[in-house]
């Protein structure tokens, strides 16, 4: 009986995902700001801003990457921090 209980505990621990998945605002263009759950292992959100003829564009999502000059990139590491 103890062996069965121990086996159930081990299986439960292995099957559960103890990692926290990050939630970022997602805004790609003119659709509007929503949220997305980032893939496992992704630890940053971004907000990217640049100017166009029609005004300032803002894009948001999961991740953080290098951008070209003239683009402002802000990266952060907490849920909904890129709003």
UniProtKB/Swiss-Prot annotation:
CDD domains in alphabetical order: TFP_snake_toxin
Keyword Secreted: yes
Subcellular location, principal: secreted
Tissue-specificity statement: Expressed by the venom gland.
One Pfam short name: Toxin_cobra-type
The keyword Secreted appears for this protein: yes
Keywords: Acetylcholine receptor inhibiting toxin, Disulfide bond, Ion channel impairing toxin, Neurotoxin, Postsynaptic neurotoxin, Secreted, Signal, Toxin
InterPro entries referenced in this protein's UniProt entry, alphabetically: Snake_3FTx (IPR003571), Snake_toxin-like_sf (IPR045860), Toxin_cobra-type (IPR054131)
A molecular-function term among this protein's GO annotations: toxin activity
Subcellular location: Secreted
Cellular component GO terms, alphabetical: extracellular region
Role, per record: Binds to muscle nicotinic acetylcholine receptor (nAChR) and inhibit acetylcholine from binding to the receptor, thereby impairing neuromuscular transmission.
Similarity-based family: Belongs to the three-finger toxin family. Short-chain subfamily. Type I alpha-neurotoxin sub-subfamily.
Name by which UniProt lists this protein: Three-finger toxin MALT0052C
């Amino acid at each position: 009986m103890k062996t069965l209980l121990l086996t159930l505990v081990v299986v439960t621990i292995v099957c559960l995902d103890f990692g926290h998945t990050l939630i970022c605002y997602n805004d790609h263009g003119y659709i509007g700001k929503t949220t997305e759950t980032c893939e496992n292992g992704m630890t940053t959100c971004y907000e990217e801003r640049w100017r166009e003829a029609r005004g300032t564009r803002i894009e948001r999502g999961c991740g953080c990457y290098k951008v070209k000059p003239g683009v402002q990139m802000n990266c952060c590491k907490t849920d909904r921090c890129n709003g």
